[in-house]
């Protein structure tokens, strides 16, 4: 009898705690606010108008479709000219934020490095004044905002702000904190690309367009639960955004980036969607790319193949193919299957290619989607090399960077094993490599210290294995010991 009474009291206490939590949430609901900054006109750098302002509009339109409803979406599409002006704008936008709120900040601008300290910078400019923003200054300004902060950086080298996208001892994560969620358009050594139409009235960044379209079309919602997490958005960008490599912190975050009602129609803007490759890997012998996509409304379509040469995407010399249905006027709505063949490359018949779908409606042309293809060698030893740190503390938000070098493009499997040789986590499984702007062929992976179930791995010793198969031959390399805990 006493045991039953004890259980009953425990259940009642749990119910009261749940009711108290719900009442507290009702009294202090989560409020979302956003500040969107786009810098187009510069004093000492190339102007990028109208791309940044168009990105700000695109982001604002996307956030306005989030069913959680933002209390404020402040757009600074004409830029911000100084760090002090940015601080004041943040204070005004997020003045009422409390510990229960979410504050989103988006930047589209130039990203570069200080020539003396080699620290990453964002360029603030309104066309009249200009000042560089360091990672520490940005962190300091955001620390003054209560609650959870979501930072989206759309700039060259933006991964450097979270220490990702390069193997460099000088890189550090300036936003390592439970208060921050960060998504960047590129790695620490990569350009982040913009596009503009011929008339100069349309444009934007590849990253912002893919992010907004992936959210609004719901293609990034892999489990179709009506919520797109940061981890899902990151995965979606890896698949749909090939010109640079998006980075995120935390690496596998369940933080909700976007929410929608599954019972309502999507709000996708593009005339083309659901682009699917039969395979993202081609070879020296198989040089024909097969893909399919859905036409949402009548449109003319052109395909461009952009080749990666000497560490650069050759946007200036695309291989252009007109869709055969253009001859009859336009592609009609429905599912389409297409194929294109790569140009023969005698000097180096392997590397990376970007497939771009360009849609034209009347006089308006727009980038309607892109996919990255790795052209891999049929034979040869990839000469795998692996590097990683000796220890890290995931309980403090630290992540382990894993560098895997390889002589040529290949598909990698990266596995974390414990001291008994058991698999703890797969960081990659037959994942095609991609260009990172590192100067030599290499891939980077990040372990957040969690196992396959999403739980923090126990303190102890681990190793990282990287492997790939070329011409039926398996190649394997193993790291030194990595320790979690003291």
Give the role of each language-model region.
Residues 21-279, 284, 297:
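Cysteine endopeptidase catalytic domains of the caspase/legumain-like
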Residues 313-348, 423-457:
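Glycine-centered tight-turn motifs at strand-turn-strand junctions
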Residues 222-230, 284, 288, 387-399, ...:
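Acidic, glycine-anchored loop motifs typical of Ca2+
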Residues 9-18:
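Bacterial N-terminal signal peptides
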Residues 289-295, 398-406, 447:
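Aromatic/hydrophobic beta-strand junction motif of beta-rich domains
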Residues 309-310, 417-423, 462:
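Short, glycine-anchored, charge-dense loop/turn motifs used at functional sites
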Residues 355-403, 459-486:
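C-terminal tail/sorting-segment detector
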């Amino acid at each position: 009898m006493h045991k039953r009474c004890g259980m009953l009291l425990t259940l009642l206490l749990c119910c009261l705690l749940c009711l108290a939590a719900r009442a507290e949430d009702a009294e202090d609901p989560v409020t979302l606010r956003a500040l969107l900054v786009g810098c187009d006109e510069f004093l000492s750098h190339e102007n990028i108008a109208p791309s940044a302002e168009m990105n700000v509009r695109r982001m604002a339109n996307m956030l306005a479709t989030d069913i959680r409803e933002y209390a404020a979406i402040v757009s600074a599409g004409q830029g911000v000219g100084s760090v002090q002006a940015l601080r004041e704008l943040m204070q005004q936008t997020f003045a009422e934020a409390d510990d229960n709120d979410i504050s989103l900040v988006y930047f589209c601008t130039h990203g570069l490095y200080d020539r003396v300290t080699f620290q990453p910078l964002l360029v603030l400019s309104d066309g009249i004044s200009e000042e560089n923003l360091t990672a520490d200054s940005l962190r300091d300004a955001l620390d003054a905002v209560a609650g959870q902060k979501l930072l989206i950086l759309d700039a060259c080298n933006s991964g450097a702000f979270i220490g990702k996208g390069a193997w460099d001892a000088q890189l550090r994560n300036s936003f390592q904190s439970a208060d921050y969620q960060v998504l960047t358009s590129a790695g620490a050594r990569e350009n982040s690309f913009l596009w503009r139409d011929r008339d100069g009235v349309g444009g934007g960044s590849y990253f912002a367009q893919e992010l907004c379209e992936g959210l609004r079309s719901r293609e990034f919602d892999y489990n179709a639960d009506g919520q797109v997490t940061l981890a899902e958005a990151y995965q979606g960008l890896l698949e749909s955004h090939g010109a640079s490599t998006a980075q995120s912190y935390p690496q596998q975050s369940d933080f909700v980036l976007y929410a929608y009602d599954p019972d309502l129609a999507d709000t996708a803007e593009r005339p083309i969607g659901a682009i699917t490759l039969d395979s993202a890997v081609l070879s020296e012998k198989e040089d024909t790319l097969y893909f399919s996509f859905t036409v949402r409304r009548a449109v003319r379509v052109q395909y461009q193949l952009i080749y990666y040469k000497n560490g650069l995407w050759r946007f200036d010399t695309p291989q252009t193919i007109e869709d055969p249905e253009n001859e009859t006027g336009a592609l009609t709505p429905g599912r389409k299957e297409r194929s294109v063949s790569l140009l023969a490359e005698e000097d180096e018949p392997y590397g990376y290619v970007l497939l771009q779908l360009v849609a034209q409606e009347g006089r308006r042309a727009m980038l309607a989607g892109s996919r990255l293809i790795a052209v891999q060698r049929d034979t040869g030893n990839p000469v795998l090399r692996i590097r990683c740190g000796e220890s890290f503390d995931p309980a403090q938000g630290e992540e382990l960077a894993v560098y895997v070098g390889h002589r040529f493009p290949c598909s990698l499997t990266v596995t974390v094993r414990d001291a008994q040789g058991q698999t703890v986590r797969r960081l990659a499984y037959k994942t095609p490599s991609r260009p990172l702007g590192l100067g030599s062929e290499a891939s980077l992976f990040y372990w957040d210290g969690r196992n396959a179930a999403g739980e923090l791995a126990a303190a102890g010793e681990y190793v990282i294995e990287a492997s790939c198969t070329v011409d039926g031959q398996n190649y394997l390399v193993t790291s030194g010991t990595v320790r979690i805990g003291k």
